[in-house]
């Protein structure tokens, strides 16, 4: 059995995660910082860790999320708001 390959992980869930991170973030020097455990995101969206991690990776690939400090259970992210960059 061949598993289907998900080529586009920037779906509604990824954008919802991005919006959630922006809501939780603290404004800092023209951007936003958020320190959040992955388990908080998993609980919020009621999805498994693998699904959430794939969407976070897609957000990183799109340049909307930049990990600054990564620890075992949480990560400090620089969250970019595309509305502010284009406005």
Residue ranges and their predicted role:
Residues 32-45:
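A short alpha-helical element within helix-turn-helix/winged-helix DNA-binding domains
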Residues 55:
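Residues in the recognition helix of alpha-helical DNA-binding motifs
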Residues 1-2, 6, 43, 83-87:
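Short intrinsically disordered terminal tails
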Residues 60-70:
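A short, conserved structural fragment
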Residues 10, 70-87:
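Short, cationic-aromatic polyanion-contact patches
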Residues 7-35:
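Short helix->loop/beta-hairpin flanking segments within DNA-binding domains
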């Amino acid at each position: 059995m061949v598993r289907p390959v998900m080529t586009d992980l920037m779906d509604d869930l990824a954008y919802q995660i991005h919006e959630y991170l922006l809501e939780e973030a603290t404004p800092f020097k023209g951007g936003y910082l958020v320190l959040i455990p992955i388990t908080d995101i998993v609980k919020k969206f009621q999805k498994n860790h693998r699904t959430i991690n794939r969407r976070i990776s897609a957000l990183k690939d799109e340049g909307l999320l930049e990990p600054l400090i990564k620890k075992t259970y949480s990560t400090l992210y620089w969250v970019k708001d595309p509305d502010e960059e284009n406005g």
